[in-house]
Amino acid sequence: MNNYQIQPVEISADIISLLSGFYCGVKLMDEILHSQGLLSELHTDNPMAYCVYNEQKLLVGFCIAGQISLPFETDGCYAYVDMVDIVCLAVHKDFQYRGIGTAILDYICKKADIICSGADFIHVDALDLDDGSYSAVPFYQKYGFFYCSRSGEDAARMLYALYQ
């Protein structure tokens, strides 16, 4: 991922205009990224955007991450676990397969304790379309995420252990 720079950006209404010319090539994800609902439906604490720019200052990658508490059951007992939550991660369609998505994950892992103090896991509901036309699951599995369960119609809940 040479000559790219990742910059944290505060979440605001400006994010939608920033993403106006950004297309990853997956229709549902592009619709989400260009929707005002992207901001109103953030179910994570302290969300932050992470933008990847190339030398020409073109936005080539994008991620929103924050903190979430999810319930886990162990031996019949439930506990809530705080973890980093990747709300969305996308790479511009013209810049895919160049290591940008992996670089974003590397960055999120390095900043995990800042995003969510004491987090042991990163959580993502990876886009996984029921019709089989697209799945981000192999990308996350290649990085080391493990599949937990379905999460709604179009997503697979996945976790990554930060301290393996």
State the predicted function of each range.
Residues 1-40:
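Short amphipathic alpha-helix that is part of the acyltransferase structural core
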Residues 45-64:
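Conserved beta-hairpin
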Residues 60-88:
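Conserved acyl-donor/pantetheine-binding loop and adjacent beta-alpha core of acyl/acetyltransferases
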Residues 87, 92, 127:
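Residue-level recognition of the GNAT/N-acetyltransferase active site
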Residues 91, 97-112:
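Conserved acetyl-CoA-binding loop-helix of GNAT-fold acetyltransferases
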Residues 105, 112-128:
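Conserved GNAT acetyl-CoA-binding A-motif
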Residues 117-119, 128-150:
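Conserved active-site alpha-helix within GNAT-family acetyltransferase domains
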